[in-house]
Amino acid sequence: MHAISFTALLLSMLAAVGLTATAGMKALKDDFDTVALFEKGQILLTVVVLAVSAVLVQALVVRDFSYVYVRDYTDTLLPLFYAVTAFWAGQNGSFLFWYLCVALMGWCMIYTPGYSRLDNRTKVFFWILFFLVEIFFLFALTGPSNPFMKLDPVPAEGRGLNPLLQNPGMIFHPPLLFLGYAGYTIPFCLALASRLSGNGREWLELCRNWNIVAWIFLTAGIILGAWWSYMELGWGGYWAWDPVENASLIPWLAGTAFVHTAIVGRTRKSLLRTNVFMVALTFLLCFFATFVVRSGMIDSLHAFSGSRMGIPLLVFMIAVLSLTLFVCLIQRKDDSTHIDDFASRPGMLFLASWLFLCLGGIVLLGVMWPVLSSMWSANPVGLDAGFYNRVCLPLFAVLALIMSICPWFSQKHGIGDKTALGVVLGGGAGSAGIIFALGYTQPLALFSAASGFMMVVSIVLYFVRTKGARSFLPSWGAYGVHMGVALMVIGVAFSGPYKVEAEAVLNKGQSMTVGAYEVQFIELRHHHDNPAMDMHAAHLAVTRDGKAVGSLAPEKRLYRSFEQSTFAEVSVIPSLGEEVYATLLGFNEEGSVSLKVSINPLVNWIWIGGTLSCLVAFLCWRKIERR
């Protein structure tokens, strides 16, 4: 099956090249009556990638170690569920999964009402662009990122899946990111196709639902990745500003900026070229995120080593950027970049969009800083988390402030409801005063928390005072997303600067004090009944003011396939207030343990807010009538 699968991908690439060439020649001749051919071609390409993906999954399930990929990411002790998810654990499999998502979305596009509203000219340009994207994926899968390489002789055992990836967060985090990346392919191709065909306005409405879905997947992937970092790595935090973490954040920032400029574009019939550039930039940055992971230029916990995809990705990104600039430079009669007044709701949305882009630019600069600094330094260094916290967090707080006051500006000029705006500002000032009185006086955290509470007040007040919003489902979606963001802002404001942590070496029966909590070491238990690993758990009792709070059992695990390393499994006592978080750093034969215990205030507000934002965003979906 190795050769058959590889040949199928190779033939798919040749078919995509043929379809692109045919579409290009038809476009040059102004012949746009062969759209059905391209649609059938896309269906065929999708069926092929579904088939080869099934082959790889089957090989992973039965542990067919004649595949290099299966040998590298599974072993006979790996549970079936994790064997299936190993499909996207490595760079070759994840690239196949990404292409599978792109192909499936292309297939779905054919049957959407929005697609039926496109004229044939726009459809032909759409398929030219879409097939070009697929050609890149197929080139990668038949060249530097081939998941069907054969291994001879066949080993009796595989190398196993990294234990850090054997976690629910990492099972779903990568596919959600790839679904988000793939989702932006449709708006990108639709925007450029509409621009090239001269049908420059309708695409914004037609790609609305695609944009929402892509944003939801990307947001969910990032939130889940942060939760995985918090629950699996054992360092007590959720965002380390690691280059690969940042790389996935950059397209999200650009995509969020596009969400807001698209609103202005649809309602004010302006910013058409700006929106084309925004969606193309988001699409491009999805590949930049992959470039950071696979190029080997950036050092990161998450990066793949030894990848040959760096140069192909760089060439592809240059081609996309060049095409985007060319398309954006084409003048259209309906082009308008005019904002009537920045002291208006469209003006606030536009300002928020540019702040998102500025944040993306800062994070991009930080990611590339080791590469840039190598131009003038023999010892290039990256920027630490302190840089991002000092520069980015204040801008996020300003964005929260803008989101809280934006609903009270009118569509054309000035403040539409001064009374409501006064209540919102008063709510922010009042919450800041209460927070300060409670002893939380750190300036940035105080400003951020007050901005978050202002958002909550603003959203509740908006629905109280605006009857139309209460009866319009997309309003519930949009403001529900903002409510989730408000909860996240408040969670970040408290969980970062007000975290309390301590480390201690304890013997049986001894205790350590962490903030207002007393943590007592009860016993160390050893478990050897799992054939895949040995587990060593420290059982702890937690009290506060003499009253029992709960128990903890952080673990150290030694996996048979990774005996050179031990892996921590944290334990938490969940709370909407202060969460107690424990990591077992080590132990000795005498039974003493080394522990790290943290008290993380309001950290669960981040996960609740992120989940809320992802779920209610589906309410923003709007029905599009077929033509």
Segment roles from a protein language model:
Residues 1-8, 32-35, 58-92, 146-174, ...:
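Membrane-interface interhelical loops and short amphipathic "cap" helices
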Residues 1-32, 47-52, 65-67, 243-253, ...:
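Contiguous transmembrane helix-bundle modules in multi-pass membrane proteins
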Residues 10-20, 94-226:
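A conserved hydrophobic secondary-structure block that centers on an alpha-helix together
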Residues 28-49, 108-133, 195-216, 241, ...:
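Membrane-interfacial loop-to-helix junctions in multi-pass inner-membrane proteins
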Residues 44-61, 136, 217-226, 285, ...:
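A generic, lipid-embedded transmembrane alpha helix
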Residues 49-78, 85-106, 110, 139-149, ...:
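Transmembrane-helix bundle segments that line or gate the permeation/cavity pathway
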Residues 175, 182-192, 203-260, 274, ...:
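Extended, hydrophobic alpha-helical segments in both membrane/secreted and soluble proteins
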Residues 425-430, 486-625:
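Accessory, solvent-exposed terminal regions and/or long lumenal/extracellular loops of proteins
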